[in-house]
């Protein structure tokens, strides 16, 4: 039994790490997963990032085997191949994208058809089982799978809002270093400020909320806010630290003006 699945990256509009309520926007960096159900009880993972072999998704695949066993009584093991355009642990929602793609591929392999919300619930469960998320990151998972601007309450497992994203380029500034979620301090003391940004975003002022989120996250995590100021001065419509960093994202209509600021040009999707 074999199956395929795909999902995409996303950027942060409002970070949900403080209270589980976040907003994210899909971008067109893709993750593809191939899953084969094995007779033998073992897990095999091959993974490639930007065409180069790199270990990602092992904990997710191990947890996927357990999830399929408990939910669908699928015995045996899993062989998975993961092909990602998203550098891991850079704040660009690679974990959510890999989790989504693996769930879709596994369901395809066993012949199960479920709706998008059920895919998201399984993906969040998978991420929690693998221990790679604090909140469940439903906002990231939904933006990754569905595209558009997605606001969600991960603790209540509710999508609060989804709207189509404008057709605008996104310039990404992606440092070489990784920042695992486990290294990020507790942000719960700032939950009221993030609540205000969440309300601003779902009221329609999501670009303004994104910018203010960037300044707040830079202050809390000791990033240089001048990186955001530079993007705005070069014509960006909005910019922010994405997730817990270290990547920054700038939404713009003239990406060529930011090519010296960033590394990768993507698109909202």
Describe the residue ranges of each PLM region.
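Short beta-strand scaffold segments in enzyme catalytic cores
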Residues: 11-15, 31-35, 140-144, 149-151, ...
